[in-house]
């Protein structure tokens, strides 16, 4: 059965260290901004098991806006305060964040921020919200449309409430706006929506997506340990995926194999990784974790949040843990 979850308002935790909320720096000029983990959909291919039908999630997070901006400014300053892209891409849908327009406005006011982009399935978007986001400074909406067949679209979204016609109307509205760009970003799920991908390409080109950036960003479905795995799907290799994209590029004469430079993405210093794999760290347990079997902890100086697995101790417990993962400052640890 779908899990029951609690919602935590994050107002005094470090915003570096957890994949579910806060900020992620992967060593480029793009900073991932994750103000909320919630999502109204339960897509059958979701890599983060989001939405009402989640089986693995224990907690949802909503981050205080002032705290988010404070930590964002810290990372921007570290990177040199120039040519920064703030990419709002949650483990759910950013439109679930109640202060999204204000977030975009505040991000746009940070010195060095030149692009603000957002990833969404669009079900919570309206023409009014699009206007407000554009006025606040949003540069581009990456809109996931995974099928143009209404029944298949509902199946992929994991809910009968998914309204494809609404999302298409919003897509066309965004494309008509001169001050905001649209990128259509379907997930290609082999054996399920193969025949939809050419239709989506034709649709994106027809409505005028990609005024400044590429019109399409086709995503390869990947099976993740705690993500959803549609029955009967056989994964494409990356080689197969790129060969298919190359064929479609040739047919439609549009760019489908994307590179970082297509978006102005380049390497930039990454904020320091404070703890190495195998290192012993004293932490305090401060919250339930994002997924079942996890707890959230902070280090002694409250500089990083650390996900602790394989233990269930009371909140407030101080304990030593061993870091087992630290890539891009996303920390996972086990108790000693």
How would you describe each model-predicted region?
Residues 165-228, 240-260:
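Conserved C-terminal portion of the radical SAM core fold
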Residues 264-336:
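Terminal RNA-binding accessory module
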Residues 67-70, 74, 99-109, 128-132, ...:
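Alpha-helical scaffolding segments of alpha/beta enzyme cores, especially the outer helices
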Residues 47-68, 75-97, 108-126, 134-169, ...:
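Core AdoMet radical
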Residues 1-35, 48-59, 74-82:
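N-terminal [4Fe-4S]-dependent radical SAM core
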Residues 39-46:
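Short cysteine clusters
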Residues 101-107, 193-214, 272-283:
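Short, electropositive alpha-helical surface patch
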Residues 222-227, 237-294:
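A C-terminal junction/extension of Radical SAM enzymes
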């Amino acid at each position: 059965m779908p899990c029951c979850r609690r919602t935590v308002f994050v107002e005094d935790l470090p915003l570096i260290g957890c994949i579910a909320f806060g900020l992620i720096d992967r060593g480029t000029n793009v900073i991932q901004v994750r103000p909320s983990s919630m999502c109204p959909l339960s897509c059958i291919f979701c890599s983060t098991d989001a939405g009402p039908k989640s089986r693995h999630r224990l907690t949802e997070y909503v981050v205080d806006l002032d705290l988010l901006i404070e930590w964002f400014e810290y990372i921007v300053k570290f990177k040199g305060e120039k040519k920064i892209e703030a990419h709002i891409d949650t483990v759910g849908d950013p439109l679930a964040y109640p202060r999204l327009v204000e977030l975009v406005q505040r991000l746009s006011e940070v010195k060095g921020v030149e692009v603000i982009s957002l990833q969404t399935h669009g079900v919570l978007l309206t023409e009014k919200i699009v206007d407000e986001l554009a006025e606040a400074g949003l540069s581009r909406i990456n809109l996931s449309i995974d099928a143009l067949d209404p029944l298949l679209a509902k199946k992929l979204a994991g809910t009968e409430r998914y309204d494809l016609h609404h999302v298409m109307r919003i897509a066309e509205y965004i494309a008509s706006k001169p001050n905001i760009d649209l990128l259509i970003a379907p997930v290609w799920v082999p054996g399920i929506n193969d025949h939809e991908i050419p239709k989506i390409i034709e649709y994106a080109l027809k409505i005028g997506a990609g005024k400044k950036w590429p019109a399409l960003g086709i995503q390869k479905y990947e099976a993740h340990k705690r993500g959803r795995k549609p029955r009967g799907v056989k994964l494409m290799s990356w080689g197969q995926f790129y060969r298919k994209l190359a064929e479609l590029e040739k047919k439609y004469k549009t760019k489908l194999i994307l590179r970082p430079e297509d978006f102005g993405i380049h390497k930039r210093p990454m904020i320091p990784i404070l703890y190495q794999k195998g290192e012993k760290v004293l932490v305090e347990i401060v919250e339930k974790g994002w997924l079942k079997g996890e707890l959230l902890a902070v280090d002694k100086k409250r500089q990083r949040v650390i996900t602790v697995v394989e233990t269930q101790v009371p909140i407030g417990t101080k304990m030593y843990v061993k870091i087992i993962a630290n890539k891009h400052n996303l920390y996972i640890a086990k108790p000693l």
